[in-house]
Amino acid sequence: MTKNFIIKTIIVLVLFLLNFSIANAKCKFMMDIGDKYTDSHKDKYGILYGEDDDQYAEVKFPAADFCPNDNFDDNFFIRYTFISDRLAAIQLFADNSIDNSATESMKLMKYAKRVYGDFDTGGNPQYYNNFNIWEKFQKYIVYNRKLIENIWDEEIYISSDKYYEELALYQSMSELIEPLEEEN
């Protein structure tokens, strides 16, 4: 009797701990904001820059590669943005190019609430059309969900003040250069 009770207690405890660890799992991103893309990253993920080597790079991976416990399917991706080999931003986003099923699944919203904190989505979360910002560990995290011409645009954007400013500067410089190239 005592032996059966101990075995049942251990099984229940193990199942509880396993369930708790999976429920609180979060994506294990390639690296943290500001970290350098090293040779070991190159070996694992490939080189960042192409022929132009302008020190700006974006690489995209299926979210399931970095978030195996979150049931993200083929409609969810992670985009890493690098400036001078440093990770400047992470975007976890839903690809609704075919239909809105990724956003309608509520997976990204549930992930944001579970990992970064709850926020008010109104009476029906399916119709949430807004954003929420968290500031944590010298980073900011933005959950953004907006409806544009009947297509949901949904993402979690992670960066820091320093790298946000660098990205904004890079984009403004790119906009200045593009019209000059078109004139020639």
Q: Which stretches of residues belong to each language-model region?
A:
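Sterically constrained small-residue positions within well-ordered secondary structures
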Residues: 16, 69-71, 83, 125, ...
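Non-cytosolic coordination micro-motifs
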Residues: 25-63, 89, 94-184
